């Protein structure tokens, strides 16, 4: 019975820590550039695009395809940075817990 109470307490503590971590992640931002800084993108912790800066030199009709590629590259880089930061925070929170390898938490 004591073990069950202890597990319930641990689960409640973990839930509170996860909520705090989710709140912290929501306030994070990740920025990335492509094309040597010609395009810069910033994503919020929730993954929404919060800023996009484009160098005026790319605002030419013949540069549209290059601009599209640079936006995609910057977005993908910013997303990867955000996911890495989230994984790092999640790992520190779940250290020592018996979670199977490859198990993805729902946030």
Curated annotation (Swiss-Prot):
UniProt-annotated location(s): Cytoplasm, Nucleoid
Pfam families for the chain: YbaB_DNA_bd
Gene Ontology terms, MF aspect: DNA binding
InterPro entries registered for this protein in UniProt: YbaB-like_sf, YbaB/EbfC
One GO CC term on file: bacterial nucleoid
Main localization, broad class: cytoplasm
Superkingdom per UniProt: Bacteria
Keywords noted in UniProt: Cytoplasm, DNA-binding
NCBIfam families: DNA_YbaB_EbfC
Role of this protein: Binds to DNA and alters its conformation. May be involved in regulation of gene expression, nucleoid organization and DNA protection.
Quaternary structure, from the entry: Homodimer.
Record protein name field: Nucleoid-associated protein Oant_0022
Species whose genome carries this gene: Brucella anthropi (strain ATCC 49188 / DSM 6882 / CCUG 24695 / JCM 21032 / LMG 3331 / NBRC 15819 / NCTC 12168 / Alc 37)
């Amino acid at each position: 019975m004591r073990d069950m109470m202890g597990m319930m307490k641990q689960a409640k503590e973990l839930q509170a820590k996860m909520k705090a971590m989710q709140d912290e992640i929501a306030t994070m931002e990740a920025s990335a550039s492509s094309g040597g800084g010609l395009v810069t993108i910033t994503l919020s912790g929730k993954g929404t695009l919060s800023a996009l800066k484009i160098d005026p030199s790319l605002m030419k009709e013949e540069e549209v395809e290059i601009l599209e590629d640079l936006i995609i590259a910057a977005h993908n880089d910013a997303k990867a940075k955000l996911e890495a930061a989230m994984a790092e925070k999640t790992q520190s929170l779940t250290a020592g817990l018996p979670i199977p390898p490859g198990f993805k938490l729902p946030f």
